[in-house]
Amino acid sequence: MADLLRNQPIPSKERLNTMTRTVVESKTKTAIIGFDEPFCVIGERINPTGRKILAEELERGDFSRVEADAIAQAAAGANILDVNSGAVFSNKMAEDPRYADNNFVEPMLMPELIRVVQNAVDIPICIDSSVPGALEAGLEACEGRPLLNSVTGEEERLELVLPLVKKYNVPVVAISNDDTGISEDPDVRFEVAKKIVERAADFGIPAHDIVVDPLVMPIGAMATAGHQVFTLVRRLREELGVNTTCGASNISFGLPNRHGINNAFLPMAMGAGMTSAIMNPITLAVNPTKIAEKKAELVAAGIILPDEIDDETFVTLLGMGSTKPTPGKEMEAIRAANFLFDRDPHGTEWIKFNKVAPKAGQEGRGRAGRKGGRRR
């Protein structure tokens, strides 16, 4: 099968666009990752790795933050939600040594996470774990056709994950590292991706069900990181005919004003042919403590605040953000790029995203609160 793949003629651009559509489904909704499709946003927030409070809540059986994160990301425009089960249960570990092993914890936790997310929102899921048992437990619990995250070029991982991809007929994220680790050489990363596509073909898995992560390096540590990934994405598209994804925020790691870097990187990656990203689609709500501190600061400066001012009005007036999660600036950049690349016909999504809800009493009025009607 791999030899057949190697000998196939390169398809035309039009045929390539039609062929390379990765279909991910929930029970009721479909997300398509493709060269001629709007950019696919995979929300990353349901991940206890590095989120101590979330991990502690999950250990107590409290899934309220997972539900809230799912709803907020879907509302912000995420097309797929990544669900990661990599939690460390420190308290249970002290009582039962089995909890020190992720191979014990994650196969139990993953189905619970998926059930909570599926009950909260109706968009497709990306099952994310380094534990094959957790991946299969997630596949059993998931409705529709989820995206599996992930396989690598490591021999053991290939032999464990690709049979699951074939058995459940699902697409998979392929990360471009192998048994030698992560190479800084983009040519090596391309060869790893090619190896995964060829091995997948041996299992009867088509290239359109492989979504390659070419591994975005931090530009603060490697000045050529951006240029490398753009070149690599073009090669993956033209030579292997696969869709691509990345951890978008990796590019700005360790830098000030990370949103500024991310906002530039994402449209440029889209222009190079990247078709999806695993990213945070929301701007977090302003912390109540910060609101209280700012109010105290203003009062100390002799500024009198109206008694009737609510927190949302307060933070809006001061440019602090919102008391509710809102779509992040990266989502604005992606929607603009979709429009500019002709993946948003007539700018429908751009207009909907930027439409300001009328204030109370202003419904049905034109600009500046005028009543509708022809100017005389």
Language-model features, listed with the residues they occupy:
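Domain-level signal for soluble alpha/beta catalytic cores
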Residues: M1-V211, M217-R376
